[in-house]
Amino acid sequence: MVPVLKVFLVDDEPLARLRLRSLLEACVDPRAEVVAEAGAASQAQAWLRDHTCDLILLDVQMPGPDGLQLADILREREGPTPAIVFVTAHAEHALRAFELDAIDYLTKPVRRERLQAALCRVAQRLAE
């Protein structure tokens, strides 16, 4: 049976979230289901207090706390932390992202093949 990853999209650009949703629908092994979306790190943090997901596709640069700050906050909290794949137009933040235990770092525009590879890495990590 093909696993289904529960994905939370966090990006301040609605069109970027729409594009990611479309790309995720094309992924088949593993499959991905978008369980929620947020346009700001503060919204994401509030949602994550009461919900869980397997993966957060997280933009780096957003108004208010950015994606790197959100990842740092999530890493410090108690309990399991979802896998994080950063999705951004800014490649210069990659090193910091991996210091925060990111599974991958995708640059925009995201290609389906790269997203599929990142989903496979997340599924492997969850299976361990």
List where the protein language model places each region:
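Two-component/phosphorelay signaling modules centered on CheY-like receiver
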Residues: 14-36
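Non-catalytic signal-transmission and effector/linker regions of two-component phosphorelay proteins
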Residues: 1-8
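Conserved sequence signature across two-component system core domains
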Residues: 10-11, 38, 56, 88
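Short active-site oxyanion
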Residues: 6, 33-34, 81-84
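Conserved N-terminal glycine/acidic-rich loop preference
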Residues: 2, 13-19, 53-55
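CheY-like receiver
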Residues: 45-128
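Conserved Asp/Asn-Gly motif in the active-site loop of CheY-like receiver
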Residues: 35-44
